[in-house]
Regions:
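Acidic, low-complexity segments
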Residues: 1-446
């Protein structure tokens, strides 16, 4: 795919079937002329970035297509200190996510006694005075060695009611071998709230997951706490020189995967099937495109590609040849199955630049699908997003929140010779995309 770049400020893509050429125009900040401060496109959409910290090359304020703002705070080392989204900026909340870095470790005669850590705070709109906190500890190699998270554990003793307890959930300890590989991994433990920044040295009482490696750092055997074992063997196929990886799970099921020197899978074998070995082989062309798949019964599926690396034909044994045509932009224009070819018909696709707007079927045009998108003056945060979809069953309209989440859908179903039924469903999310509320409105008939 070719594109035009004009003085580094405008990129124009190839034309689609309508002759439309998508373009993006870039405007740079006036001080250093290095960082993009505004992007416009052929749809009329625009996004902006501003308040640059040139020392670190980062923008502290960004505006999306729906003209909603996002802010970032940095510390003196260029690390992100706090992030605010549209919800927080509208309500005056200081952050949705904040970070506190404490990278300095405490050393004793036997090494690190207190590792460095960082605290991540997630603002919780349901509990404004109680952030959800995550503490990550790292060792001298920069490896995360422990993670603590806020949590609630429900316990119940026989004969008593369940009890909720607020705790810190501590990730399981890892034991490393001399080569820095995880040899033992323990289950998580819990601790009382109040010592979140203190490394927890406790090991869970349950046996750990034990991993044994070969000299090439490949896992050879993994033993779970219940003594279930997964074994992996590595060998070379004598005929093709492919790497053969044979995995045996705890139930004795065995599967072999053959990969070539480029890491592509050329053959898989189910070695423990009830009807014998089940083999699937794969063939590629000179530029690593999958062109042939042969199953264990000798059935062959082939694929053909054009010079633009687009698949133009797929021929599975069950359904026959399916062909595709494309425009210069790479949009699929037509699809023709073996049955449609007999009648000289195709499924046709329409686009607005690179955006799908319609699917037209050769038979039963009432099943055609249309897509409508929000323009530059759309409301409900629908600029640049799918606004309405129409198909044979009716239509569905979308309403969005400030973070791009779907807040409401209006589903209209057309029942032939009966009535038009409308269903309205609404959702409410916080800034972490957690569902807080769902409202379902009963059907309304017209």
């Amino acid at each position: 795919m070719l594109s035009e770049i004009i003085r580094g400020t405008k990129t124009t893509l190839p034309a689609n079937a309508k002759g439309q050429r998508m373009w993006y125009s870039y405007r740079y900040e006036p001080v250093m002329n290095m960082y993009v401060s505004r992007i416009d496109d052929a749809f009329g959409y625009s996004s902006e970035a501003g308040n640059f910290v040139y020392r670190y090359g980062m923008a502290l304020r960004r505006t999306d297509l729906n003209r909603l703002n996002y802010e970032t705070d940095l510390d003196n080392l260029g690390r992100i200190k706090a992030v605010r989204g549209p919800n927080e900026l509208a309500t005056g909340v200081p952050y949705v996510i904040a970070f506190d870095y404490q990278p300095k470790a405490t050393f004793g005669t036997n090494g690190i006694t207190a590792p460095g850590y960082a605290v991540t705070k997630h603002y919780d709109m349901q509990h404004p005075s109680d952030d959800m906190e995550t503490v990550t500890f790292v060792d001298g190699f920069g490896r995360p060695v422990q993670v603590k998270k806020d949590g609630v554990v429900t316990t119940a003793v026989k004969g008593s009611a369940p009890k909720d307890e607020t705790v810190m959930i501590v990730s399981g300890r890892n034991v490393y071998d001399a080569f820095g590989r995880v040899a033992k991994a323990y289950y998580p433990v819990t601790e009382a709230v109040g010592s979140k920044t203190t490394f927890n040295k406790a090991f869970d009482n349950v046996s750990p997951t034990v991993t044994v490696y070969d000299v090439l750092n490949r896992a050879m055997k993994v033993t779970l706490p219940d003594n279930a074992e997964t074994k992996t063997e590595y060998s070379t196929d004598a005929g093709s020189n492919a790497l053969v990886t044979t995995v045996t799970d705890a139930l004795g099921n065995r599967q072999a995967t053959c990969t070539d020197g480029s890491g592509k899978t050329v053959k898989t074998e189910q070695l423990s099937g009830p009807d014998g070995i089940i083999t699937t082989s794969f063939e590629y062309d000179g530029i690593d495109r999958l062109v042939k798949v042969t199953d264990t019964e000798g059935n062959v599926t082939t694929s053909v590609y054009d010079m633009g690396d687009r698949r133009t034909e797929v021929n599975p044994p069950a359904s026959g040849i399916t062909t595709f045509t494309y425009d210069a932009l790479g949009n699929v224009l037509t699809k023709q199955t073996a049955n449609l070819k007999k009648e000289g018909k195709t499924i046709n696709y329409e686009y607005d630049y690179g955006r799908l707007t319609a699917i037209n079927y050769p038979d039963h045009p009432e099943n055609n699908v249309k897509y409508h998108y929000g323009g530059i003056n759309s409301s409900y945060n629908r600029i640049g997003r799918l606004m309405l979809r129409e198909d044979g069953s009716g239509a569905i309209e979308y309403y969005y929140g400030k973070m791009g989440e779907v807040l409401k859908t209006v589903r209209t179903l057309i029942v032939p010779n009966q009535a038009v039924a409308t269903y309205v469903t609404q959702w409410k999310y916080d800034s972490h995309n957690r569902l807080l509320e769902m409202i379902f409105t009963p059907m309304r008939r017209k």
